[in-house]
Regions:
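Bacterial N-terminal signal peptides that target proteins for export
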Residues: 2-14
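An anionic, turn-rich surface loop/hairpin at beta-sheet edges
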Residues: 96-129
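Internal, hydrophobic beta-strand segments that form the core of beta-sheet-rich folds
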Residues: 131-147, 151-161
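Short amphipathic, basic-aromatic surface patches that mediate peripheral association
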Residues: 66-74
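Post-signal peptide N-terminal segment of mature Sec-exported envelope proteins
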Residues: 34-54
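Bacterial signal peptide processing site
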Residues: 27-30
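C-terminal motif of bacterial Sec signal peptides marking the signal peptidase cleavage site
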Residues: 22-25
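Short coil-to-beta strand junction motifs in C2/discoidin
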Residues: 75-81, 151-154
Length: 164
């Protein structure tokens, strides 16, 4: 008769428990992100990036990020944007945003690879709660003097549900 060591018995017990704990520890983060590619990296003032996201939980707070990707050849340290948010069944709320992309001393903000830079900035400085559940529409347009504004690759919104 073959002897089964205590280690073999533990192996068959520990492995399934470890797998269950690993699977249970994986928590899905509620995230929405939509980025719109700017055609030919030339953002005309008439071109508006837009999209929509659904809010189901009105108790939790959400972080809303503006995501912008540009090349190293972009000639300004900032970009002025008109950001619109339309709650379900309500009118459009517009906000002008001066998004700082860098400065002359420290260079570009965000993450970069070769000559491409991505900046992700929290809008309004803190997470917010949505008053009503439903479909929210957003729009982003550039309001700089240059038309078209060159070397902007994409722009979008990222919405993350914060942990309570």
């Amino acid at each position: 008769m073959k002897k089964v060591s205590i280690y073999n018995k533990l192996h068959f017990l520990v492995l399934p428990i470890a797998c269950c704990l690993f699977i249970a520890s994986c928590k899905q983060i509620d995230v929405y992100e939509k980025n719109t590619v700017i055609p030919n990296y030339e953002w005309s003032s008439s071109f508006t990036a837009s999209g929509n996201f659904v809010i189901k939980d009105t108790v939790s707070a959400y972080s809303i990020y503006l995501v912008l990707r540009h090349t190293d050849a972009y000639k300004y340290n900032n970009i002025w944007l008109n950001i619109g948010l339309q709650p379900p069944g309500d009118s459009l709320i517009k906000q002008k945003v001066d998004l700082q992309l860098g400065d002359d001393v420290n260079g570009w903000e965000g993450t970069g690879m070769n000559d491409i830079w991505e900046v992700r900035k929290l809008l309004n400085g803190q997470p917010r709660r949505f008053k009503q559940a439903g479909n929210y529409n957003f729009s982003i347009s550039q309001i700089m003097r240059d038309n078209p504004l060159t070397n902007i690759m994409s722009v979008g919104i990222r919405v993350e549900k914060r942990n309570p």
